[in-house]
Amino acid sequence: MLSRRIIPCLDVRNGRVVKGVKFHDHIDMGDIVELALRYRAQGADELVFYDIGASPEGRSVDYTWVERVARLIDIPFCVAGGIGDVETARAVLHAGADKISINSPALGRPQLISELADAFGVQCVVVGIDSIREDDGQWRVRRYTGDPSKTQALPMRTLDWVAEAQRLGAGEIVLNCMDNDGVRRGYDIAQLRQVRALCHVPLIASGGAGEMQHFADVFDQADVDGALAASVFHSGAIPIPELKQFLRAQQIEVRDGQ
């Protein structure tokens, strides 16, 4: 196993970083570039930026802030939001992103995954999956979660979509466990373990980090390749250098800070 990755997630709306709870009630957390520079200095392994309004609003990501981030940081970063075709993806990568992530557009047209993988290589193509547990006990996917008024429940089971996304060429899966998002009670280990059993590409856990032990738990118990978090990093509740020191003490291999 390679070193586990620590990945701050920055949800972007109207050019600012925001954060909600279970994808609702977003509040302003700060400037995109300022936060990106802070995380780079703290030793984040990479960054993920979600333009959360892009897909619900039927537009592509704003390239201007992608270019600003690319000029100032030297760690890998991934961009998501309204990337619905090869040309849009090319523009985002040309602006400086290392990877692109697709979610709602891929649910609407799964072949997009293959088109992007063919154009740029699977290493550039991340598929984000917003998943929630329904009353029958099954996890199913949601679309357009960046706007609660437009969020759609789909009949597709999360596990089936993970398998299909890999078949089509996804190079990495980010599983956003919506039930756990922003509540800081830990990652959804049960769901992540089921996904891990059939996921043969890097798997990133998202949703639920509240304390350092939660990161250790998700690495040890769900065998994920990376852990993504937002509110605990934005608020300063968990400083990344201290987190990495804690994980090393738990015999979990992480990269040294920058």
Swiss-Prot record:
Its EC number is 4.3.2.10. GO terms for cellular component: cytoplasm. It is found in: Cytoplasm. One of its GO terms (biological process) is L-histidine biosynthetic process. Keywords: Amino-acid biosynthesis, Cytoplasm, Histidine biosynthesis, Lyase. It comes from the Bacteria. It catalyses: 5-[(5-phospho-1-deoxy-D-ribulos-1-ylimino)methylamino]-1-(5-phospho-beta-D-ribosyl)imidazole-4-carboxamide + L-glutamine = D-erythro-1-(imidazol-4-yl)glycerol 3-phosphate + 5-amino-1-(5-phospho-beta-D-ribosyl)imidazole-4-carboxamide + L-glutamate + H(+). Coiled coil: none annotated. Pathway: Amino-acid biosynthesis; L-histidine biosynthesis; L-histidine from 5-phospho-alpha-D-ribose 1-diphosphate: step 5/9. It holds the Pfam family His_biosynth. The active site is at 11, 130. GO terms for molecular function: imidazoleglycerol-phosphate synthase activity; lyase activity. Belongs to the HisA/HisF family. HAMAP family: HisF. IGPS catalyzes the conversion of PRFAR and glutamine to IGP, AICAR and glutamate. The HisF subunit catalyzes the cyclization activity that produces IGP and AICAR from PRFAR using the ammonia provided by the HisH subunit. Heterodimer of HisH and HisF. This is Imidazole glycerol phosphate synthase subunit HisF. It comes from Xanthomonas oryzae pv. oryzae (strain KACC10331 / KXO85).
